[in-house]
Amino acid sequence: MAAKDVRFSADARDKMLRGVDILADAVKVTLGPKGRNVVIEKSFGAPRITKDGVTVAKEIELADKFENMGAQMVREVASKTNDIAGDGTTTATVLAQAIVREGAKYVAAGINPMDLKRGIDLATQAAVKDIIARAKKVSTSDEVAQVGTISANGDKEIGEMIAHAMQKVGNEGVITVEEAKTAETELDVVEGMQFDRGYLSPYFITNAEKMVAELEDPYILIHEKKLSSLQAMLPVLEAVVQTGKPLLIIAEDIEGEALATLVVNKLRGGLKVAAVKAPGFGDRRKAMLEDIAILTKGQMIAEDLGIKLENVTLPMLGRAKRVRIEKENTTIIDGVGEKSDIEGRISQIKAQIEETTSDYDREKLQERLAKLAGGVAVIRVGGATEVEVKEKKDRVDDALNATRAAVEEGIVPGGGTALLRAKKAVAELKSDIPDVQAGIKIVLKALEAPLRQIAQNAGVEGSIVVGKITDNTSSETFGFNAQTEEYVDMIQAGIVDPAKVVRTALQDAASVAGLLVTTEAMVADAPKKDSPAPAMPGGGMGGMDF
């Protein structure tokens, strides 16, 4: 086993604090509307420029092992906040640094670290409660756009694009961010349920110019097995012909005689029909066919359900307002499924998402959820250079996560104001144990840190800004707009943060910082000493003295 290097008490805390400071100082320059960028060297390709706190944090690895441990703990704060809320990573880092710094001073002065942590936890709970109580529900598309704009570093175009996407696909819909091939950033929305299977034969096309098959108000037959003969289907085909409506057949595969018969009928005009393969594979295919059945109020024809093809009647077929089939994709628009059935299915998928441990499964389940809930939107981020596109994509990702969080738990005044106002609730806490009270004091001071940093990045003295906002007791939403360097009503000015992001940042920062403050010893691998190289043999032949 390798030898270990051990550091104790003040020596350990000093090293750890230095690591915390190095990482936090690199991350906090990105905070606020006037935050700067950080350039990160890549082992290949162009350097990466970003204003995303967690991206910077993940790149930092220090040479000194003890300093690195401190840095890694704060990196954990940023990663955790990013995983839960998707934004607020820089705020969390600034809060963690403030709590650790103050905590280290108190511990050095001889205060009990465990009581100190208890005080930090009590104060954090009070502040979180206050933030949740202040949260205002997001009701309009404009408010959604405001949240997106603030998170995208004041980029209005991004904020409005996200609001538009959310309006189209709903809060459960999937919004993905991709890199565009052009310089423009654009939004592409697919309404209804789309799956990646196209028509089985080009003869099904109804619009030759666009190469698509469009079926208005069709019946939909959902079959989980292969169809190689249409004999068993004749009764239901005849019933569909009587109604004069088109028919879409979704099956594992349609081959040979069955496909030929359908094509001939389509060309003769007897039956308006189109056939596509079922999406997915294995169990996922079955689940997706069930989703389609629920969406269209149809019945999935499966032998294990005891339904045979020859017994299928018209009421067992699904219905939709319109179906559009392209070479690669099929979109079912406005299925007639019952709202209650669809909602039941959605909550079932949500429960599966909660339980799954596989990222791949989670992604696929979220796709299914979005398709049921109303659609998929793709934001394609464009820019003049690859570096610019990557930087912009980071901001769009942040804005998207912040917007989702805002819809979930509401919004609070932005720019660090909500944390500053939470001081009032924390100040009311009183403890008989002086060391616990010291922990409460630490959080009281730390709650100012994000606002101070935002002001500092804008070139304004942080303590003056904090003083001005604290003195104004008439309005709870009064704050500092760092973009214009004015004092405004933050909600009216549209400077808002999602409550979930602010809450998560504080909880994660306090959790990790509390652990760092209570550290008394640190253990790391001792540096390996390089053994000196063996001496070179002397020249000349042995035994000869010249």
Swiss-Prot record:
Residue segments, region Disordered: 527-546
Alphabetized PROSITE patterns for the sequence: CHAPERONINS_CPN60
EC number in record: 5.6.1.7
Record-level GO cellular component terms: cytoplasm
GO terms (BP aspect): protein refolding
Keyword field contains ATP-binding: yes
Keywords associated with the record: ATP-binding, Chaperone, Cytoplasm, Isomerase, Nucleotide-binding
Locations listed in the record: Cytoplasm
Reaction equation(s) it catalyzes: ATP + H2O + a folded polypeptide = ADP + phosphate + an unfolded polypeptide
Disulphide bridges, residue numbers: none
GO molecular function: ATP binding; ATP-dependent protein folding chaperone; isomerase activity; unfolded protein binding
Residues involved in ATP binding: T30, L31, G32, P33, K51, D87, G88, T89, T90, T91, G415, D497
Stretches with biased composition (Gly residues): 537-546
The keyword ATP-binding appears for this protein: yes
Gene3D superfamilies with a match to the protein in the record: GroEL (3.50.7.10), GroEL-like equatorial domain (1.10.560.10), TCP-1-like chaperonin intermediate domain (3.30.260.10)
The family this protein is said to belong to: Belongs to the chaperonin (HSP60) family.
Subunit structure: Forms a cylinder of 14 subunits composed of two heptameric rings stacked back-to-back. Interacts with the co-chaperonin GroES.
UniProt function note: Together with its co-chaperonin GroES, plays an essential role in assisting protein folding. The GroEL-GroES system forms a nano-cage that allows encapsulation of the non-native substrate proteins and provides a physical environment optimized to promote and accelerate protein folding.
Protein name: Chaperonin GroEL
Species this chain originates from: Methylobacterium radiotolerans (strain ATCC 27329 / DSM 1819 / JCM 2831 / NBRC 15690 / NCIMB 10815 / 0-1)
